[in-house]
A protein has these predicted regions:
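Hydrophobic alpha-helical scaffolding
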Residues: 2-3, 33-38, 56-60, 115, ...
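Acidic, Ser/Thr-rich peripheral helices and adjacent loops at domain boundaries
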Residues: 99-110, 196-203, 263-275
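Short secondary-structure boundary/capping segments
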Residues: 42-45, 97-101, 192-195, 236-237, ...
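Thiamine diphosphate
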Residues: 1-56, 61-75, 181-257, ...
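Short amphipathic alpha-helical segments and helix-helix/interface helices
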Residues: 13-17, 44-45, 71, 165-166, ...
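Catalytic-loop motifs flanking and including active-site residues across diverse enzymes
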Residues: 40, 161-165, 200-207, 235, ...
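Flexible, low-complexity linker and terminal segments
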Residues: 53-183, 283-315
Length: 315
């Protein structure tokens, strides 16, 4: 990608830095200092430094060795990394080199202290990132907040409304569930443990697609109407393009609960969902646990893209 593409993906990249990675994750950035292929000139280095990505500049004569080394570095640190080339060199043949052997990637395991990017854990995650970049030992993990006592009181009324749905959802635990930052992310805490990774608004669906393609074929994404309309629907397009039979739980409560309660018109959500009518599994009474169980059971029985739309009544 070019630096402009990196800027568009910066929220996802930054969250990958804080979450860490299981396998190597290397971005190949085409820097365009003369603007021959870009609408503006943006230097890649300062952007990568701001995102705290390890990176190296390379060219046709050294890219083989440099790429091998940056992959190994990403794997060793458990962090994303980048290699920067000049866009003007894109058509220049590279010198072939023997790749350095990279040890097998460790297997993914659930690590909510590291992977739930929520305010209660962000200071620890910041300290872990600093230690990784400095090559020192990370601090010991803090205890996870427990639901509901460890949850801010102002969020509990909204979370209580979600409880019947998440009791049913947790009972059908999949091997991987991605969530968006928001109040529902609290259901990643014990005793529910219903969400494994929480990142930026709109990140749940792309993450779940990646998990599915990596072999977690029962993966779920949990998102809210505000996050879905803001960015998550782009992931739905990707699921269709890749023909991924993903399972999505969409919490439609009609407002941006976490950021101040801004209204989300149901007509706007319906307009976005109109193109996916065959994928919709309606859940019109998410306060009824039996209705939730029925909708989730129907979803897991389908071998196609499925979106459970849980429409909550006004509080």
């Amino acid at each position: 990608m070019k630096t402009h593409g990196l800027l568009k993906a910066a929220n996802a990249v930054s969250d990958a830095v804080f979450c860490g990675t299981t396998a190597a994750f290397v971005l190949v950035i085409a820097d365009d200092p003369t603007g021959i292929q870009s609408d503006s000139v943006i230097a890649a280095g300062p952007v990568l430094d701001a995102l705290e990505l390890p990176w190296v500049a390379s060219g046709p004569a050294t890219i083989g060795c440099d790429l091998s080394r940056i992959v190994a570095r990403s794997e060793r640190l458990g962090l994303p990394a980048a290699i920067v080339i000049d866009a003007a060199d894109a058509s220049t043949p590279a010198v072939a080199t023997d790749a350095e052997p990279v040890p097998p990637s460790p297997t993914y395991r659930r690590d909510p202290v590291r992977h739930l990017l929520v305010p209660a854990l962000i200071r620890h995650q910041r300290a872990v990132l600093s230690a990784r970049l400095a090559g020192t030992d990370p601090p010991p993990p803090p205890p996870l907040p427990r639901f509901p006592d460890g949850i801010p009181p102002r969020w509990r009324p909204a979370l209580d409304r979600y409880a019947p749905l998440f009791r049913a959802f947790a009972a059908r635990r999949s091997s991987f569930t991605a969530g968006d930052i928001g109040i529902s992310s609290c259901y990643g805490f014990p005793p529910y443990d219903a969400i494994d990774v929480v990142t930026y608004m709109g990140g749940a669906i792309p993450l779940a697609i990646g998990a599915h393609l990596a072999g977690r074929t029962d993966a779920w994404a949990v998102t809210g109407d505000f996050s879905f309309i803001s960015a998550g629907h782009l992931g739905l397009l990707e699921a269709v393009a890749r023909e991924v039979p993903l399972r999505i739980l969409l919490l439609a409560n009609g407002q941006a609960e976490t950021t101040g309660g801004q209204p989300v018109p149901s007509s706007l959500l319906d307009r976005v969902l109109d193109g996916y009518a065959d994928a919709i599994v309606p859940l019109d009474d998410p306060l009824d646990e039996h209705a939730c169980e029925h909708a989730l059971k129907e979803t897991v029985s389908r071998d196609e893209l499925s979106v459970v739309v849980a429409r909550f009544p006004p509080p």
